[in-house]
Amino acid sequence: MAIFHKKPKEREHPEQLTPWERFQRDAAENHRAAQKSHHSWSGKRLRIGDKLPKLKSQRRRLLFKRVVILMGCFLIGAGVAGYFISPLSHVQTVTVHGNDQLSVTQVKTATKINPGVALWSVIGHDQRTTKRAERAQPQIGKVTTKLVGLNSVRVTVKEIRIAGYLSTGQHYRRILENGLILKVTYSQPGGGSPIYANFKSGHRLATMIAQYAKLPSAVKHNISEIKFAPNKANPERVHLYMNDGNEVYATISTFASKMAYYPGIVAKMKTKGVINLEVGAYSYPFKNQNN
């Protein structure tokens, strides 16, 4: 006779479970929760792992960029240093332009621009070079420099024109059109510029030079001597001896404006004579001179 054991019915409510059944149920739930947490953490680790190659690639690019910058700075610094110690950074040849009264050697000496000097001390320092040149050679008014090729320098000077030579007895001193009287004395005056004689007043001489500077070049070159010759009627009278053989009487304060008529007056004269520009403008032959 078979004996059948009847399966006990599952309890429908938790409060009907025995302590052992409740323990087994809690253990099973804890196991399932642990497995779920493990799978979730593994997924996160996989996602972070996917990002690691990208981070490494970014770091490599950043490192490469820094290395390139450092190498670039080093190469630039080395190139600059190499240039400054190489012959390319020094003046190789010097050419001088614009000089008329001054020689090339005088300009080079005054500016101190000679082969061998550093280019960086010359190019871009025209104002400083001009001041240095003026102290050494007052006849230099302005200096400009230009780099030609790799290391050749073109020096252009603007001279202050010579207004003439001041007679000081047995010697002569050069006068510039800016009124400066140079200290150097000469036994003979230079050609192409007038001699200033009998000028005792510095103010009179300065005014005369300023008036002379306004004249056209053709008239300037025709004046041989300017002699201060005042009289009672005209304390500013000057007596000029011209290279063409004529003589002129004029007034210092109106000298430039009156001398502008000189070429036209001479063209109408039939013989050499005297031209008086003190009051009005008229001329007469030497035989009728009465001064």
UniProtKB/Swiss-Prot annotation:
GO cellular component: cell division site; plasma membrane
Extracellular side: 88-291
Domain POTRA stretches: 89-160
Cytoplasmic-side segments: 1-66
Cellular localization per UniProt: Cell membrane
Transmembrane segments: 67-87
Primary location recorded for the protein, binned into one broad class: membrane
Pfam families assigned: FtsQ_DivIB_C
Lineage: superkingdom: Bacteria
PROSITE patterns per record: POTRA (PS51779)
GO biological process, one term: FtsZ-dependent cytokinesis
Keywords of the record: Cell cycle, Cell division, Cell membrane, Membrane, Transmembrane, Transmembrane helix
Family: Belongs to the FtsQ/DivIB family. DivIB subfamily.
Task performed by this protein: Cell division protein that may be involved in stabilizing or promoting the assembly of the division complex.
Protein name: Cell division protein DivIB
Gene designation: divIB
